[in-house]
Amino acid sequence: MTETAVIYSNGNQECERMTMLLRSLPQISEFLEYRVDKNFSEKAFYDEFGKEATFPQVAIGYKHIGSIKETLQYLKGVNWIS
């Protein structure tokens, strides 16, 4: 099964690392990156994900996974990484 991954990024180091990881996964068939101030505003980011949200935010398929920590936990849970 292949999935689409979406990352909401501000270009920081954590976003770049998550981008590299998601692009390397064979389960990800399509990768989309949305950048703050290019594809959305910072206000729209916090309106969507909450005032405490951090960059990056990740969605896989139709499911919003969350922050880098939540995404790593999810990927381990589905055995995409060890």
What is each stretch, according to the model?
Residues 34-52:
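Thioredoxin-like thiol-disulfide oxidoreductase module
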Residues 9-10, 36, 62:
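Conserved residues at beta->alpha junctions
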Residues 31-33, 64:
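Conserved beta-strand scaffold positions in the cores of enzyme catalytic domains, especially
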Residues 60-82:
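Non-catalytic, surface beta->alpha helical segment in thiol-disulfide oxidoreductase systems
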Residues 49-59, 68-69:
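Structural micro-motif
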Residues 1-30:
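Local sequence-structure signature of Cys/Sec-based thiol-disulfide redox active-site neighborhoods
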